[in-house]
Amino acid sequence: MAKKKEPSALVLRYLESLNNPQSQPQKNLDRRSPQHRRVQDNNSVEWWNSHEVQESQRQLATEFIETIPNYISGSLKRCGIVITGGGKYFVSAYITIRVIRMVGCTLPIELWYLDGEMDQQMIDIVSPLGVTCHNASEHAKGSDYFLDNWWKGWQLKAYALLHSSFAEVLMLDSDSYPVRDPSFLFDWSGYCEHGAIFWPDVGQSRRMFPHGAAKSLGVPSFTEIPTESGQLVVDKVRCWRECHMAKHYNQQANYTYHIVYGDKDTFPTAWHRLGTKYARMWQVSNFVKPGILQLDNEGETLFQHRIHDKFRLPGTKFDSTKQNAGENSVANWQHEDFCHKSLAELRSVWK
């Protein structure tokens, strides 16, 4: 690892500004895409578009790259699945885990969550399914990685990817589950060549990554179909630096999430920043209410990403909807009967 350098004066000024509540309003912590956000400071200037902030972010990323530690050979082993989702997403995570096992996948699973999102009963429910649970807030204690707002749910994905115990990872959102055993992805030619697979976002055509965002993140403008991070596959040994870079962009969420939509764009951006190629499942994803059908390299459905109408159980500790089991069945989605049977089983044991 290169000798750590002191931050530049420009970066220090920027970092100091992050502690000034007058410098960056936080009232718009919404889910709209960056181009639809119009949050302004007291001078009606979008602070993240200022030249000094953009330049400081670029320098901060450059200086961070010099501090990325070398991978310690043999410190990570085997392939595994990482899922993020406790709290109100626990039910979705449970269904995803049950489906993974039902389709014959035997890969070990790690479930990562934040403080207050899992109790011992919830851990005991998933442990017999070959799942190890990790409290990311406890794991990150002493660092300043997570923000104190709901954006930390987006930040969690890059953190869990990097800090999981697996050398090769299939990363899943809690509501993205496979329709058949996805283990073959670790042997797919595109993955073997590049060490990473990303999937396209729904209903998107090729477009140029915004020049201003690219400049501030230190990457050249590039044109491609935007990605969707409900599922991705990464060889962390080969892509160790890229995983650290993605974590850095998410740690800078107070800036990054103003110019890209949450965590989903930070992964390809990290690869571009380091000049690393990755494999794409180029077939356009399909939107079939209530979510996205992600395809394999032959155009067959592989993942069902339930971005709307998620599985929930009313009356439980983390319920946030009045939706009842059975009311959200989707006739043309695979494994629906099994999902709702699993939902009923969860209701019987989780109070």
Residue ranges and their predicted role:
Residues 135, 153-209, 232-233:
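GT-A fold catalytic core of metal-dependent nucleotide-sugar glycosyltransferases
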Residues 79-83, 100, 109-111:
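Hydrophobic targeting segments
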